[in-house]
Amino acid sequence: MNIGTLTINSSLALAPMAGVTDVAFRQICAELGAGYTITELISSKALCYHDKKTLSLLQQFPGEHPAAVQIFGSDPICMAEAAQIALEHSGADVVCLLYTSPSPRD
């Protein structure tokens, strides 16, 4: 399977799961055959605020490739900044952007 020029050499891909797909879980899944790993959903606003706990969600294990970071939010400017932060802090091959409707909390 290919995502653009990125080749995934396994038919198994890890789905993003909030509170589950931390770096240790992703490494176990890769060792068991997952050919593609992805972080849990990460808030673009938390990345834009450089929240330490949120930045820790970007951690990768050595050799974690191909790998993706999944970011959600409703502010296009913050989403763009968060994508850049994710690339700088993670080394991910793919950044998935999930745009949401603005809510009263935004």
Question: Model segments located where?
Answer:
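An anion-binding catalytic pocket shared by soluble metabolic enzymes
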Residues: 14
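Glycine-rich, positively charged N-terminal anion/phosphate-binding segment
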Residues: 1-3, 17-92
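Membrane-interfacial amphipathic/re-entrant helices at transmembrane-helix boundaries
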Residues: 6-7
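Conserved small/polar residues in nucleotide/adenosyl-binding loops
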Residues: 99-106
